[in-house]
Amino acid sequence: MNSQGYDESSSSTAATSGPTSGDPRMGKKQRFMNLIRTTKDVYIPNLTSSISQKTMDGIRSTTNSFEGYNDLPMELPHNTTITYFPTYTTTNLVDPDGLSAPRKDFETTVRCAVSYPGNPTSRRNRWLLSLCKQYLRTGTAEADVAPVVPPHLEEDSGDLNDSQSSIESSLSSKSENRYSHMGIQEEDVLNERIQGFLSKKVPNTPVVVDLLPKDKLRGDTASFFGTTDSYGNLLIKAETDFLPSKINITLDTPIEGHADPISETFPANYVSPYGIGLISDIDDTIKHTGVTGDRRSMFRNVFIHDVQSWVIDGVPLWYKTLHDVADVDFFYVSNSPIQTFTLLKQYICANFPPGPIFLKQYSGNFFSTIMTSSANRKIQPIANILKDFPKKKFILVGDSGEHDLEAYTTTALQFPNQILAIYIRCCSNSMSDVPSHDEEVMNEVNNIIELQQRPMQMTKSTVRTRRRPPPPPIPSTQKPSLTEEQTESIRMSRRNKDENNAKRVAPPPLPNRQLPNLDANTYYVPSSQNDYGMYGAFMDKKADEWKRRVMDSIQKLSNQDTTLMFFSDPALSLEDSIRRIREKYSN
C-alpha cells in the first residue's frame, strides 16, 4: 500500500512473522523495528499510566494524612475540661459451651467528652443567646420567633468584629416595647444552663485511660488508648483481670501554658451481672418536661424553672423503694441532648438512686435538638445494656408522651427472656382529645391489657371449679318401725302442707353462670364506627389510636412473660413491680 494507506496492523503482523526474504540482516532490522514499536506503543504508555497512578495515590494519601493531621489539636486551650459519663464495670460471665473466645474477668465501659468553653462573643453564640431570650419573653408569639440558626452560623465562626448590639437589635426591636422582658435571675439561669450548647468539642484528641485496682497492694494498672470522635466523645470497653476502683483519664496532648497534660480521676461503678435492673426514661417519666405541651412551656421547664419543680410526686419513692428493698440497679436512657448531662445528673443524684445516664448526641440546629425526639433513638443504648447483662432481668419505664410503648415492645421481642414488665406513665394531654378524659382512656387500655394479657389469672380468680357432691347413702332394706308420737307428727305435717299449698313460695336464685374469657375486641368499639352516637358524643382519635397501639403491643407480646401497665399514680406501679419481682424470685 502507498504511504497514505499505510496499514499499521498488517505491518506489525508481517514484522512478527519474520522477513519475507532470506537476508539475515533484514530479519535483525525487522526485529529491532518491532522492539522500538512495541516499546513506544505498549510499554511506555503502561509505565506512564502506572507511574501517574502511583503518584496520584501518593499525593492523595499525603493530602489526606495532612488533612487528618491538621484536625489534631496541636495545643489544647488552658480551660479544656474532661466530662466523665459514669457507666459501669461488670463481671464477664463464663461461656458454658466454651464457644466464645476467652475473656478477662471484668469489663469496664468508659465514656467521656473533651471540650472547652465557647467564645461568648462569637456571632453564632450571640445569635443563639439572643434568640433564646426572645423566645422566652412572656407574650411573644411563637410565630414571631423563628427557632432557626442560619446555616452560616451553625458552626462557630470565631471572634468577629460584628457588635452584639447590631444582632440583638435585629431580633428584639419588633417586640422591645410590646412584650415584657426576662427577669435578671431568669437570664442568669439561662446563661448557665445553655453553656453546654455553646462549648466547643475537641475532636481527634489522643486519650489515655488507666484502670486502677481496688487493692492498692497489687500494683496492677491497665492502660488503654483511644481518640475522641468528631463530636469530642470517647467510648472504650476495657477488660481487666482485676476489679478496678478508679478510672484515670489523661489527655495525651500539650496544654497551652501548662507543662503537664490534663488528667482527672473518677470512681468506677460495679454492677452485678445478676438480679433486677430498671431502665428508665427521663423526660415526663421522672421529671416534668412537657413534651406534649406547647414548645415555650417545655423550653422554660428545661432552661428556666427550678430543678425541684421537675419532681413528679411518687416516682422518687417508687425508685428508692425498689433500690432499697429489691436491690434494683438503675439505668437512665433519654433522648435529651448530651449537652444537658450536668444538669440532669444534678437532678437525678438529688432525687433518685444513682445510675449511669445515657443521652443522645445531636448536631446541627439548636432548637431542633431541643424540640424533636424519637423513641427509636433509645433502642440501641437499651440493647447495649441488655447485651452487657444477659443474665439480668429488667423493668422498662417510659411515658405516653413519646413512642416508648413501641420502643419497649421492640426491645422485649429482641430480648424475650430479660424483660419482666413495661410501665408507661400517662402524661397530661397525651391519651385523649379531651384532656379531662386521659384518666378514663388510661383505665380503658388497662382493662384491655387485663383481659388480654392475664386470662389465666382472671380465670383462676373468678371461675371456681365445682366438686362433684358425694353419693347419697344406700337406704336400708328393713322397714323402720314408728312410734305413736312419730306417726302423729307425720300426720300433722301433711295437714299443714295441704293448708299452705295455695301459697306459692319464690324459687331460689339461680347460681352464677360461668362466663368464658372474652376477647378485648368485644368491648372495643372505635369512635370512627360511632356514627349514631351510641357509645359517645364525639370521635376521640387519640383514644382510638392508643387502643390500637396497645392491642398491637399485646399481640406482639402474647408469647412473652412480660406484663404491661399504664399508670398515673406511681403507688400502683410500685405495688405491681414489687409483686412482679416476688413472682420471679419465687419461681
From Swiss-Prot:
Residues 9-22, 163-174 have a biased composition (Low complexity). It is found in: Cytoplasm, Cytoskeleton, Actin patch. Optimum temperature is 30 degrees Celsius. Residues 467-483 are annotated as: Interaction with SH3 domain of ABP1. Optimum pH is 7.5. N-glycosylated. Its EC number is 3.1.3.4. The keyword Chaperone does not apply. Inhibited by N-ethylmaleimide. It is an enzyme of class 3 (hydrolase). Keywords: Cytoplasm, Cytoskeleton, Glycoprotein, Hydrolase, Lipid metabolism. Residues 1-28, 150-178, 452-521 are annotated as: Disordered. Its main location: cytoplasm. It catalyses: a 1,2-diacyl-sn-glycero-3-phosphate + H2O = a 1,2-diacyl-sn-glycerol + phosphate; 1,2-di-(9Z-octadecenoyl)-sn-glycero-3-phosphate + H2O = 1,2-di-(9Z-octadecenoyl)-sn-glycerol + phosphate. A motif (DXDXT motif) lies at residues 281-285. GO terms for cellular component: actin cortical patch. Pfam families: APP1_cat (PF09949). GO terms for biological process: lipid metabolic process. InterPro entries: APP1 (IPR017210), APP1_cat (IPR019236), Mg2+_PAP (IPR052935). Mg(2+)-dependent phosphatidate (PA) phosphatase which catalyzes the dephosphorylation of PA to yield diacylglycerol. May play a role in vesicular trafficking through its PAP activity at cortical actin patches. Can also utilize diacylglycerol pyrophosphate and lyso-PA as substrates with specificity constants 4- and 7-fold lower, respectively, when compared with PA. Present with 2289 molecules/cell in log phase SD medium. Monomer. Interacts with ABP1. Contains one Asp-Xaa-Asp-Xaa-Thr (DXDXT) motif, a catalytic motif essential for phosphatidate phosphatase activity. This is Phosphatidate phosphatase APP1. It comes from Saccharomyces cerevisiae (strain ATCC 204508 / S288c). The lineage of its organism: Eukaryota, Fungi, Dikarya, Ascomycota, Saccharomycotina. The gene is APP1.
